[in-house]
């Protein structure tokens, strides 16, 4: 494990080339923990989702540099709870 944990949060629905570039840059800085927003968050944001949480988790886990993908309470529209979860875990 690297010295730094880099937190990336988002819906990633679907993961596209811009996301991949972000992951590649983050990987240069440290190990990546992904805070993956819920299906409900995507419905509130976009009205629907393309890939469900489990499918998005599977894709994210297979990106080089990702050491963990976490579900978190995003009911308030923020990633605050997820960040606190990462701090507690790592």
Each language-model region and where it sits:
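Nucleotidyltransferase catalytic core that binds NTPs
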Residues: 1-90
């Amino acid at each position: 494990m690297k010295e730094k944990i880099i937190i990336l949060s988002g819906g990633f629905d679907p993961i596209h080339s811009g996301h991949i570039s972000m992951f590649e840059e983050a990987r240069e800085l440290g190990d990546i923990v992904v805070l993956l927003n819920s299906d409900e968050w995507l419905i509130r944001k976009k009205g629907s989702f393309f890939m469900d949480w489990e499918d998005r988790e599977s894709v994210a886990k297979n990106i080089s540099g990702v050491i963990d993908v976490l579900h978190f309470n995003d009911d308030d529209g923020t990633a605050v709870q997820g960040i606190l979860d990462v701090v507690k875990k790592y």
